[in-house]
Amino acid sequence: MQQDPQRRSWYLGPLVVLTLLVGVLIGKGWERTGHATETYEELKTFSEVLSQIQKHYVEEVKPKDLVQGAIRGMLATLDPHSAYMTPEMYKEVQVETKGEFGGVGIQIGIKDNRLAVIAPIEGTPAHRAGIKAGDFIIKVNEESTKDLTLMDAVQKMRGPKGSKVTLTIQRDGVADPLPFTLERDIIKIESVRTKVLDGNIAYVRLTQFQEASGRDLSKALKKFKEQKLQSTILDLRNNPGGLLTAAVEVSEQFVAPGKLIVYIKGRDGRKDEYLSRMKDAPEEYPLIILVNEGSASASEIVAGALPDWGRAVIIGTTTFGKGSVQTILPLADGSGLRLTTAKYYTPKGRSIQSTGITPDIVVKPQPPTVVAKAADKDKDKEGDGKPTAPHPAAKTPTTPPAVAKPGEEPSAKGAPGDPSGEASLEEDIQLQKAVELLKTWKIVKDLKPL
């Protein structure tokens, strides 16, 4: 079955369950046949427990608090990505997909049963402080994250601009936990950034998949076409994902009309297909996609679809491996559910859940100590001849590069993968490899302008 990508809430079954739950709590019932009978009996027990707590617990408890706690527990038994959202949390999610919210600027997930940083958002307090993709958050302030749901962790990290929160990080290869005290800010996300590399290579940095990402990318590609650029690098490193529809809208600009981009499959086994809806076939110019362990979800849809159609070469390191689809389901009281409703598959039927996308060409980022030495060498040449103090390796960012946002001051020289500033091509060996490959590509094949 083909899906219109504009539809987001395509699975509504859980709403029925919650309606039945409310019905039982107020004394209503329904036909006791099949699974309904089993569910009814279980809900009778739930109602009895609720009644006993209200009658005998040592302190008076609000029914709303008990029911919300039960809902959270219900969703916690499913998977780390399913969660209940209070009305306040639900509103924040709606704001976030539009590109602005308050907090420290990291996307989180569950990996190896621990709260993990999928990616820091470029130019935010978390990124500037040196938090990296792959870090594990073991405490928020002094509270352990062991039993926190994803939504609860998000809530604890967000807050008013100017307020502070301390995250305790466990980093692979570092023996002791690392405390980071961050000052919250308004997180504004510009999803598409561009520049020209080596005179004729279009570079597109996609930081997240938002409602406007497809439109913004289309505008950027049209501009590059006017400049007659001959090849493109699509940088998805440290892109934690976003909207499924945005991933489809980005992918369809590189494949022929009617081509399958991704399909999702729920427990009923039905395939919902998302096809390219472009009217005209795009130019088939050389395309390289850069990925790393911070590339997740919607990023992996793009990084899976385009190679399946022979439209791109993937360079970098293995991606995060989040291959499940969460649907946001609004509830009558203004709250909502974030529920895993399906898994997604690339056009060739590959699932990336827990495995990720393995690049065609594996290139690991430059070690931070090498970057620090290179930076010191440059400073010695440019300065008065006096050597400068070496950069502490622990403070040298190793996440991939990107262009500074308009209106922001870029760092003097970012380390490879420092998205808050402009890393030089010489320092970013993953980007360097992409440029080298495109140069070779141009030698062996006549290229059409973009």
Task: Annotate each PLM feature.
Residues Q2-D4, I26-E42, F46, S51-P63, ...:
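Cleft-lining beta-strand/loop regions that shape enzyme active-site pockets
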Residues Q2-V16:
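N-terminal Sec-pathway targeting helices
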Residues P5-R7, I314, A415, K442:
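Cysteine endopeptidase catalytic domains of the caspase/legumain-like
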Residues L12-G27:
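Hydrophobic membrane-insertion alpha-helices, especially the h-region
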Residues G34-V58, K62, L66, L75-Q107, ...:
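Glycine-biased strand-turn-strand hairpin within the trypsin-fold
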Residues Y57-I118, K164-T166, Q170-T181, I189-T194, ...:
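Extended, small/polar residue-biased N-terminal targeting/export presequences
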Residues G336, K343-L450:
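Conserved functional hotspot residues or short segments at active or partner-binding sites
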